[in-house]
A protein has these predicted regions:
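Core catalytic alpha/beta fold that binds nucleotide/phospho-ligands
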Residues: 1-199
Length: 199
């Protein structure tokens, strides 16, 4: 079975090592991070750049939608929420989304879901599973968030068909955060989590 690697950095670890992160990213990554006014956003940006640099020394390229990639692979995708910054890595197109599992007012968000998904939310299905499943597929295909309503959230786990291609999605809870990983394949995959505790 194929393996998807999931690297995680706790935001507290990243804060503790901010000085080291500043030394481990290039000048453009540093400039990008320091443009953020909020320090937590600076640290998230630095940690994300650190993860990308750890993966490859190749220059980053960007597709038409702005999704970063390496010319010679591997495929990767980054997300952050709450306590964590995560990066999923695969030999095929990949998307990841993480959301802190907390109470949320659904009234303003229900419009982004199709009828079946909205019904599930109204019947108390977990919003974050639906959101993460949608978001990870959007990120896998490198599409715009403007298309979110047409992106299928279901199933949370298993094969889904979109635009004539098969994707396999896995959703799970890790330390009070919901994570969805979507990969361009109809084959299941295992996830190997690597927690980065020192930088």
């Amino acid at each position: 079975m194929e393996i998807v690697k999931l690297y995680t950095i706790d935001i507290n670890t990243a804060f503790h090592h901010k000085k080291a992160l500043l030394e481990k990213v290039n000048e453009s990554q540093k400039e990008k991070a320091l443009k953020y006014k909020n320090e937590i956003d600076q640290v998230r940006s630095l940690a994300s750049s650190y993860l990308v640099n750890k993966l490859s020394k190749e220059p980053l390229l960007f597709n038409d939608m702005g999704k970063p990639f390496f010319e010679n692979g591997p495929s990767f995708n980054i997300s952050h929420s709450g306590q964590y910054i995560v990066m999923a890595v695969s030999n095929k197109d990949i998307g990841v989304d993480i959301e802190e599992n907390k109470e949320k007012d659904m009234s303003s968000l229900i419009r982004i879901f199709n009828e079946a998904e909205a019904k599930m939310i109204k019947e108390h299905a977990d919003f974050y599973y639906l959101w993460c499943a949608k978001e990870s597929l959007i990120k896998c295909i490198g599409s715009s968030i403007n298309r979110i309503k047409e992106i299928p959230a279901l199933p949370f786990n298993g094969v889904k068909l979109f635009n004539g291609k098969h994707y396999y999605v896995k959703s799970f809870i890790e330390d009070k955060h919901i994570i969805s990983i979507t990969r361009l394949s109809d084959e299941p995959f295992d996830i190997k989590i690597e927690k980065i505790n020192s930088l």
